[in-house]
Curated annotation (Swiss-Prot):
GN (gene name): adk
PANTHER family registered for this protein in UniProt: NUCLEOTIDE KINASE
Species this chain originates from: Shewanella oneidensis (strain ATCC 700550 / JCM 31522 / CIP 106686 / LMG 19005 / NCIMB 14063 / MR-1)
Stated name of the protein: Adenylate kinase
Binding site for ATP: G10, A11, G12, K13, G14, T15, R123, V132, Y133, Q200
Self-association and partners: Monomer.
Keyword DNA repair applies: no
């Protein structure tokens, strides 16, 4: 079972990825983790990637595709894999197809932008312990204070509203076209495309996922 998971930052992909991995015994392949592992292992592609990254440049699609092919040939991918954060663009999706990497299911978790902004910009963290609160969904007993220590809570830079909106803008510009792309691939009968409402409870989304991934 070869799966691609699409969705904006904050849509709940990580939680559902965990569910899929546990339910179906397939590894989650994140390009970031894969790059780090290849660099650490000192593989030819890893060394090439390190050279590019050390120069402060972006790793090319060809190099990433090479790493993906190398990774999915490993034993733990025998039953399939879950690609997270890749492909991000249509050229990357084209390159995957050209390299014979076929996909069984493309899953989109759809959450409106305003809901994502509310979810992410409402997060508060206790820097000392890493405890996470939310002003709406999981508020501390005393506003702005950690329940255990009474110390001030902070907003992570990634959760600042302006940052969240910027990341959403990049997602819509780069990744949203993939929704249309894979819709066409599915219409041609070459993959299955599933769209889920990510504003539902985690359990409801997991249940719906399980019903289509049988």
């Amino acid at each position: 079972m070869r799966i691609i998971l699409l969705g904006a930052p904050g849509a709940g992909k990580g939680t559902q990825a965990q569910f899929i991995m546990e339910q179906y015994g397939i590894p989650q392949i994140s390009t970031g983790d894969m790059l780090r592992a290849a660099v650490k292992a000192g593989t030819p592609l890893g060394l090439e990637a390190k050279k590019v990254m050390d120069a402060g440049q972006l790793v090319s699609d060809d190099l990433i595709i090479g790493l993906v092919k190398e990774r999915i040939a490993q034993d733990d991918c025998a039953k399939g894999f879950l690609l997270d954060g890749f492909p991000r663009t249509i050229p990357q999706a084209d390159a995957m197809a050209a390299n014979g990497i076929s996909i069984d299911h493309v899953i989109e978790i759809d959450v409106p932008d305003e809901e994502i902004v509310k979810r992410m910009s409402g997060r508060r963290v206790h820097p000392g312990s890493g405890r996470v609160y939310h002003v709406v969904f999981n508020p501390p007993k005393v506003e702005g204070k950690d329940d255990v220590t009474g110390e001030d809570l902070a907003i992570r830079p990634d959760d600042e509203e302006a940052t969240v909106r910027k990341r959403l803008g990049i997602y819509h510009e780069q990744t949203k076209p993939l929704v249309e792309y894979y819709g066409k691939v599915a219409a041609a009968g070459n993959t299955q495309y599933h769209k889920f409402d990510g504003t539902q409870s985690v359990a409801a989304v997991s249940e719906q996922l399980a019903s289509v991934l049988k």
